[in-house]
Structures are given as C-alpha cells and as structure tokens.
A protein has these predicted regions:
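Acidic catalytic/metal-coordinating carboxylates
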Residues: 36-37, 63-69
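Non-catalytic signal-transmission and effector/linker regions of two-component phosphorelay proteins
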Residues: 1-9, 15, 22, 37, ...
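Receiver (REC) domain active-site loop signature in two-component systems and cognate sites
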Residues: 59
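Active-site residues of response regulator receiver
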Residues: 56, 84
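C-terminal output helix
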Residues: 88-90, 104-117, 163, 167
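Basic, Lys/Arg-enriched C-terminal extension of HTH/homeodomain DNA-binding domains
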Residues: 183-208
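Active-site beta3 strand of CheY-like receiver
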Residues: 9, 48-54
Length: 208
C-alpha cells in the first residue's frame, strides 16, 4: 500500500463542495475520491492508504467529529483537514484538540485549500516513513533470543558486563559476546544508542 500515490479523500454531504474540491485537486495534478457520507468513506477506506482527508464538520448520521474519533480508534494516521462554517468554529477547535491537521472556513479559498493539501500530504508521507522505520526496528528487537533480552534488561538498568555477569552467573566474556550480538541484531552503534532505541520502542521484554 505504501507504494500507492497519495489520494485526497473528500467527505461532504454537499455535492457542490465535493465537486469544487475535486476540480481543484484534479487541476493540481492530485488524485481524489469523493464520498457523500462518513459511513460511505469508512466502508471504502483502508488505513494503509496514503493521502489526506478533507472533511465537513457537520453531516447527517455521522458528523465529521465522529468520523475523526472512529479513525483515531482504528489507528489511522491520515491527516484531516476540516471544512467549517462560521458557526462551526468551536467544533473545529475540538477537532484540532483531537489531532486534526488543520481547518478551513467556508467559503473555501482555492489557494488556502491547496496550501493545506500539500502540507498535509507531506506530513502524511513523513509520518508513514517514520512508522515503517519503527516497525523495522521493532522486528529487529523481536528477533532477540531470551538470553539477549535478559541482557538488554540489565543494560537498561545500567549494569556493566561484569555486573551483569554476576547477576546472571555467567562469565564476563559470555555476557560481552551476547551484548555484542544484541547490538548487531538491533543495529545499535553503541550502548547509548541501544538504550535510546529501546526507550523509543518500549520493547517487549524490557523493564522500562
């Protein structure tokens, strides 16, 4: 999915708004998909698809805020740009507090929307690249043996090879070998780098 070009998803019950946004997106050379309701979008959307979401705050059946909350529940990282009327600014503020990327007041400014779309798409690409790297890092930690995990836990306690060896009733040389294997497997440059990586991941099997 990450190799797919980004898509601008437009969700609004107002057909005229959808058409206007679609024309603007197409003119900018971007892909788009339009949905007349939050439910229709949820049925079609795969969270692995890159892009951004242009979303009306108030819609019948399921509001934009409710859709945002459902996407958060599903772990979606797609940036959301809310479209609001003057009377809907409080809802837009609430949306921002729940992680919305930005909001745009009606009547929609073409340049304002384009600027937000480009920033949102760049943000989405950076976020997905970061998540991909994190998954790769997690996979490296998951490949550790039970002994390496035990040593990792002691490293995070700040124990030296000699102290870890005494705790584990092993020779310092054996601990040194396992520690070197641990660093190599996870791709850590040194012990300080290893600790930073483990703290970032809160890796399973470590007592953080």
């Amino acid at each position: 999915m990450r190799d797919l070009p980004p898509t601008v998803f437009i969700v609004d019950d107002d057909e005229q708004i959808r058409r206007s946004c679609e024309a603007l997106v197409r003119h900018a050379g971007l892909r788009s998909e339009q949905y007349s309701s939050a439910h229709a979008f949820l049925e079609a959307y795969d969270t692995a698809r890159p892009g951004c979401l242009v979303l009306d705050v108030r819609m019948p059946d399921m509001s934009g805020l409710q859709l945002q909350q459902e996407l958060n529940r599903r772990g979606a990282v797609i940036p959301v740009i809310f479209i609001t009327g003057v009377a809907e600014v409080p809802e837009a503020v609430e949306a921002m507090q729940h992680g919305a990327f930005d909001f745009l007041q009606k009547p929609i400014s073409a340049q304002g929307l384009l600027d937000r779309l480009h920033r949102a798409l760049a943000f989405d690409a950076a976020t997905r690249a970061s998540l991909l790297e994190r998954r790769k890092m997690q996979a490296r930690f998951d490949s550790l043996t039970d002994r390496e995990r035990e040593i990792l836990s002691l490293v995070l306690e700040g124990l030296s090879n000699k102290e870890a060896a005494a705790r584990m009733k092993l020779s310092a040389r054996t601990v040194e070998i396992h520690r070197a294997s641990l660093l190599r497997k996870v791709g850590a440059r040194n012990t300080a780098h290893l600790v930073r990586m483990a703290m970032e991941l809160r890796a399973p099997g470590t007592e953080l």
